[in-house]
């Protein structure tokens, strides 16, 4: 059974373009089979290297499911059914439901942090930013997100890439979403086949530039202890339908990448 879903009804609601570090990312709100969803394409560099964001989004959501973390579910749909969404050498788009209700507002962490530092007169720094995030989200949710990002090698958790849900004047942490820059989505074929290059994919945001440093901010366990070999096998089995859509070279690299990064999960178990 193919993991690519075929919807019956599609209606464009609002087209959007987002500027990323890799250029413009095409996305839009749609009614798909009477559900309001966000549809996203993939990116391309000036050098013409296309990203694999839709595949990474879906695999990351499946991994979050295995880890029992709050997350938004993503699916793949054929790109040709969404002609308003630009894709580059990619036959699929990622699709996820709107996860807020009409009486909820979503605020970027970046905007809240700017307002906080402006009101307090405190200078912004990576340390101050991290402490504010701990106050805002609490350790458990924040640490789980950082551990998850480290495991999947998410390069793009910038300050506009996680939010706060406000409902009736109260703050709530959102489910984890927007993981397109993970799981070697931006690795070239050359980087996939070179083991040393592949394992260098450890860029992090927003508190440190490398996951090896950012994971050290976690000072208490946030994941249950489990057998890492069994966990790895369950994860690979769960994402295997998506891996089957990729070249064997890329699928193998992702499997090895995740095995290598298990130590990040182990560091947060207890």
Where are the model-predicted features located?
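Short C-terminal domain-edge/linker segments immediately following a structured domain
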Residues: 68-73, 126-129, 204-210
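Conserved kinase catalytic-core segment
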Residues: 124-188
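C-terminal catalytic region of ATP-dependent kinase domains
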Residues: 169-270
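Glycine-rich loops and low-complexity Gly/Arg-rich segments
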Residues: 64-65, 119-123, 198-203
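ATP-dependent phospho-/nucleotidyl transfer catalytic cores
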Residues: 95-146, 237, 264-265
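Short, low-complexity, polar/charged sequence segments that are solvent-exposed and flexible
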Residues: 57-61, 113-118, 193-196
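A broad, structural surface signal
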Residues: 58-66, 140, 144-148, 256-263
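Conserved ATP-binding subdomain of kinase catalytic cores across diverse folds
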Residues: 1-112
């Amino acid at each position: 059974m193919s993991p690519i879903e075929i919807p019956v009804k599609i209606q464009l609601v609002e087209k959007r373009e987002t500027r990323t570090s890799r250029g413009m990312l095409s996305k839009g709100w749609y009614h798909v089979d009477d559900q309001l969803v966000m549809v996203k394409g993939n990116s391309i560099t000036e050098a013409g290297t296309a990203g694999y964001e839709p595949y990474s989004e879906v695999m990351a959501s499946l991994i979050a499911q295995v880890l029992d973390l709050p997350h938004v579910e993503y699916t793949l749909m054929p790109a040709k059914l969404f002609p308003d969404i630009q894709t580059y050498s990619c036959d699929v788009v990622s699709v996820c439901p709107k996860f807020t209700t009409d009486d909820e507002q979503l605020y970027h962490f970046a905007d809240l942090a700017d307002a906080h530092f402006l009101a307090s007169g405190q200078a912004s720094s990576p340390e101050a930013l991290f402490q504010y995030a701990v106050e805002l989200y609490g350790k458990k949710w924040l640490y789980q997100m950082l551990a998850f990002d480290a495991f999947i090698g998410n390069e793009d958790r910038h300050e506009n890439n996680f939010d706060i849900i406000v409902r009736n004047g109260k703050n709530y942490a959102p489910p984890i979403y927007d993981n397109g820059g993970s799981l070697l989505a931006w690795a070239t074929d050359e980087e996939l086949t070179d083991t040393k290059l592949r394992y260098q994919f450890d860029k992090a945001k927003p508190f440190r530039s490398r996951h090896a440093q950012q994971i050290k901010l976690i000072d208490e366990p946030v994941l249950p202890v489990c057998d890492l070999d069994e966990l790895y096998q369950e994860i690979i089995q769960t994402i295997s339908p998506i891996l089957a859509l990729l070249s064997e070279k890329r699928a193998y690299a992702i499997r090895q990448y995740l095995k290598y990064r298990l130590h990040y999960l182990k560091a947060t178990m207890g």
